Structure formats: structure tokens, C-alpha cells
Amino acid sequence: MNDLAHMRTNYVRSVLSEETAGFDPLALFSLWFSEAKEEGELEPNAMSLSTVNTDGKPSVRIVLLKGLIRNEFQFFTNYSSHKGKDIEQNRNVALTFFWPKMERQIRIEGTVTKIPKEESEAYFKIRPRESQLGALTSNQSSVVVSREELETKFQTLEKEWEGKEIPMPESWGGYSVSPNKIEFWQGRAGRLHDRIVFERKNENWIRSRLSP
């Protein structure tokens, strides 16, 4: 670990100009996301979700983007989890995408709400059966005695629901993040990175360039 001071990458892949950024951050996000997929980034829909509880304590974890619906970012999880409890207390969240092959990062700040139950159920029905059973098995973020306890419960539920449609747990569903700030970062040589930020004022997006 003593050589960390000498670890660095020189970013030379691309540039981000005002002309290429345009004035619609959601269109730019969709473009960058498509390019990340084409580049073969590992799980380009993986994003860090940052939450803060009422005591001001932050938490961050990786979740998967499952849709950009009605100009909002959707993900699914257990409502009783640590993140779910934080969100109940504080609806302000942040998302971060990092695509190292593209030398790009996107930061999103906004407010989060639960999506309608019928939309969560529609998504739950198309999940792989093992994932459905996993959601039914796990009381996310609760303490378990051992891995074996989880596997035994999974196997029991697998037999119980064999040949039947697995119901969505009441504690499981989707969230939707309405963005009010989106920042695009493109790595550049000499650490003079490009940073373009969009901030929502009423129904309009205001674009600015930030110093790196």
C-alpha cells in the first residue's frame, strides 16, 4: 500500500465541449450510457447510491439502474433495507456512474420517491426466478446466523413455490430519482478534466462549466 502515491492514469481518451454536451442532460446521459455499453464497460448500469439519515450519517452502496422512465432514474430494492430506512428519513440522494474505459463519470443529485406498486410488480414478474426467490428469502440488512441459514430458507421456499408464480414481497419495490443536478466528467491530460454541470431551475436546465 506504500506505493499508492505513485499510482496515476493519464486521461487522453476524449473531450467534453459545450457543443457536444448540448442543453439536455438526459439526452447526453443516454448517449454516454449507450457508448459505455458499446465499449464493454462491466455492468454500465451499476451506480453508487448515496443516502443520508436524519443524524447526518451518510451511506453509499452499488445498485443497478433499471430504467430512465419519465426522465427519472429507477432502481429496485428492499424497502426495509438500510437504504430504504435512510430514504424514509431523507429523500435527498445522489447517484454516481463511473466508466473507467471511457474515462467518464456522471454525478446525479435529486429526490427519490417510491414508484407505483403495479410498476414494481410488472418488473418483479420478468426477473429471473432465482432472483425472485432471493427477494423472498432475504430480509435485507438484517443479521443472519450463517450462510447456511439463508441457503436453507431459499431451498425451502423453492420447494414451496415449485410450479407456482412467486409473489412480490410487500417489502420489495422500486424507487425513482428525479434529478435536479447532473454533472458530466471527462478525464483529460494533466488533470485539466472537463466538467459540465446542469442544474434544474423550474422546468429549465442551466448549463455551466466547472473548474477541475
Swiss-Prot record:
EC number: 1.4.3.5
Catalytic reaction(s) noted: pyridoxamine 5'-phosphate + O2 + H2O = pyridoxal 5'-phosphate + H2O2 + NH4(+); pyridoxine 5'-phosphate + O2 = pyridoxal 5'-phosphate + H2O2
Residue numbers binding substrate: R8, T9, N10, Y11, K66, Y123, R127, S131, R191, L192, H193
GO BP terms, alphabetized: pyridoxine biosynthetic process
NCBIfam families: pdxH, PRK05679.1
Subunit structure and binding partners: Homodimer.
HAMAP family with a match to the protein in the record: PdxH
Task of the protein: Catalyzes the oxidation of either pyridoxine 5'-phosphate (PNP) or pyridoxamine 5'-phosphate (PMP) into pyridoxal 5'-phosphate (PLP).
UniProt-recorded name of the protein: Pyridoxine/pyridoxamine 5'-phosphate oxidase
Native source organism of the sequence: Leptospira biflexa serovar Patoc (strain Patoc 1 / ATCC 23582 / Paris)
Name of the encoding gene: pdxH
